[in-house]
From Swiss-Prot:
CDD domains: GST_C_Theta, GST_N_Theta. This is Glutathione S-transferase theta-1. Its main location: cytoplasm. The keyword Transferase applies. Residues 88-226 form the GST C-terminal domain. Homodimer. The gene is GSTT1. GO terms for molecular function: glutathione transferase activity. It catalyses: RX + glutathione = an S-substituted glutathione + a halide anion + H(+).
Amino acid sequence: MGLELYLDLLSQPCRAIYIFAKKNRIPFELRTVDLRKGQHLSDAFAQVNPLQKVPILKDGDFILTESVAILLYLARKYKVPDHWYPQDLQACARVDEYLAWQHTALRRNCLRALWHKVMLPVFLGEPVSPEMLATTLAELDMALQVLEGKFLQDKAFLTGSHISLADLVAITELMHPVGAGCQVFKGRPKLAAWRQRVEAAVGEVLFQEAHEVILKAKDSQPADPTLKQKMLPKVLAMIQ
């Protein structure tokens, strides 16, 4: 059995892996896991990943979870162009620096924005107070300021003059609040221009394909009561 990727393009880390594999022509079998149907909560899925999360990479008997680990595995195994994850010590460290920061900063805030603005009230039928939503969006704004001020600055891409894994991970995170209707690029010309460069670098068709699901998140159908009961505690823990 060749390379298998268990993904749902509703998930921002899954989108990053999907784009990376497609852009670098890495052959893989897509195993779609529909999160909104609770497929990740099944006993069968738990046999693949006891954490019951996507993404998952399966390469023969080797199973790997966690999106950054998967991206690095693919970059190393398939000898992708150096700009994605450079050999140069300091250039590589810059990519690592961003990937270390984003987990608890940009990712958390983008995830909370999507769930507080759309997925909790629309998909799970759970109201979110205006105060909670305002706090969430203010924290997202602060993370965007750091993204622009510390990481992007006046460069073409987050870590230099070429696209890297840092840019790919960042843009897929930012499309979460975009999918919720947040104007994250409005009033931020540097970030808006960076987004255009990232889209051009990966290819606009591939970019749109990967983000079709998240851009329709507002149209999600309400979860059935049984699924809601199973999902709600996990969701609340995830977005704390």
